[in-house]
């Protein structure tokens, strides 16, 4: 068995160590949040957001309401445009 | 860390870009279901016509009609670009980060925050760029006043801003799985119902006749209409091209059914517990390992190519017959609804009807090849970086004290299966979409495939959640307990 | 010349190998049985139509608004 490895057992050991080191290194810098263990996109699910950044925090319900309000503001814009004729 | 990093660009924005709060606790099943649905419905509500655009028809028509289905975009509405910017940005930035082309240390919380804020700003920025490309091209009317330009801009960017936030609401755990995918699934299913059973009466032709939007309703109404013969009504229902017809409706249903079949092809690896004796189970690996994401990627790239073409031909060259740009890039042919690309770009444009294939037969080869190559490339790389590669799965096995029956090293067996599965799955999906699109579905074929894949991905998360919460759901009880 | 040939061979071989590998994989896969498939189709179909109808109601709200203001 030993003779089949060029350089003998010790080189084999070295190679193994190098391989292990490489794998360790690859594990140390994860390629995605999920690989690091923090959720995020999986193989078949695309996720954009995982963490809560220290920004301007808003409640989800507020966002939903504002989104609807935004659409209604566009409706209002239509009304203004129609009532005032050609304003823009 | 020394040196410049792309994610540091997001730093100045961190303070004032709105950020949805994470839920304090794992929300109850019913709440999540309601929030997912409401969010997607609000998205649908956004398909409202833009104010301030001309109502007369303009020369510049829709150049990206066949890309709209996948991204849930409706022309000349607030959702002109649908959810293309967030999806494309997220896919591409996450790929780049996976390749280590963008330096992000995902182990660090600050880096993850910067990365997701970067995705958010780039998507909103993309909405702004796209909006101005379309305004400048004359798509919304020529000689718009400064006021009108400003209003269209604020409407489109505002809508884009809210769309990214809606996605975030679901992504952050207030809803199920992924916001982008929930929106696609619900918007496409609504589109399907509208195309088949829509009751809205739309004036057709010069004689003031009206026809309903839904293909099935049209068939029924056609039989009773006085100005149509029985046979005429039948033929009309199957092949009218100004509104959805039954042929394309049936094709879409067949495509959806095929995806259901593909979704459930899998290899089952038998696993056993290393702790408890005699505990054995199966671990399925799906053929569609990366689901519909490979298609989303292919279509994102297509979108970029076509927008680039549109910018060069329309914005720079003005789509003038005989100009150098048009000689090289082919230019656009203006039809009643669409802008049809000519030679080089037409190679990547699916035909508007089955018979239009013969105008550019090469498209069959180039379009399918494009979908297959980009899809397979994406799937191979995505499974590697998204934290579900063979290495990650075998690590999971170890953590859960599970081993593959008959194999000492799980990762060796998995590495033989997972990359092949994802590549083959992506190729099969690409072929399916290519067939559908080449038959003239104008984006609806690709749309339904992505939608069904997304629905399955979400359903899986929903099922797991349902079981984890012990099936405590009044909604499920109301539906007779068949929600799972 | 020889190098080019080798490259060309590789260009032809890679897709062929890919198709072969994929085919082998597909053959090994477990496909849903007819009964299973019908059940899935039914569930997905009902789900799709149910969600679609809910979404369509939202679209219906749009029609009168559009009619009034556009």
Swiss-Prot record, chain A:
InterPro entries: Sec61-beta/Sbh, SecG/Sec61-beta/Sbh. One of its GO terms (biological process) is intracellular protein transport. GO terms for cellular component: Sec61 translocon complex. Its main location: endoplasmic reticulum. Residues 1-41 are annotated as: Disordered. It comes from the Eukaryota. It is found in: Endoplasmic reticulum membrane. PANTHER family: SEC61 SUBUNIT BETA. This is Protein transport protein Sec61 subunit beta. It comes from Kluyveromyces lactis (strain ATCC 8585 / CBS 2359 / DSM 70799 / NBRC 1267 / NRRL Y-1140 / WM37) (Yeast). The gene is SBH1.
